[in-house]
From Swiss-Prot:
Family (UniProt): Belongs to the universal ribosomal protein uS10 family.
Assembly, per entry: Part of the 30S ribosomal subunit.
Record key words, sorted: Ribonucleoprotein, Ribosomal protein
Species name: Pseudomonas paraeruginosa (strain DSM 24068 / PA7) (Pseudomonas aeruginosa (strain PA7))
Signal peptide (residue range): none
Residue stretches in coiled coil: none
Protein name: Small ribosomal subunit protein uS10
Amino acid sequence: MQNQQIRIRLKAFDHRLIDQSTQEIVETAKRTGAQVRGPIPLPTRKERFTVLISPHVNKDARDQYEIRTHKRVLDIVQPTDKTVDALMKLDLAAGVEVQISLG
């Protein structure tokens, strides 16, 4: 695995949760002797929803909601076998989506 690179993409609605998860991944990778690039923050996606709160009339009565999706990217350069094993055993928070790709 010397010439490969592992790219880890993280998504979450809570920025504190995603920062904690990236910190755990970085500490685990550095402990096993791999070089880490990142975490690189990607643009936050903001989805806005407008809902009428009146059942029939009063078009002016509306509520607006927003969901923010935070994203981070980590590159692990020159991972060792210990790095891959440690990352597989790592238990991250439930609200974080993790995508791993080898390149």
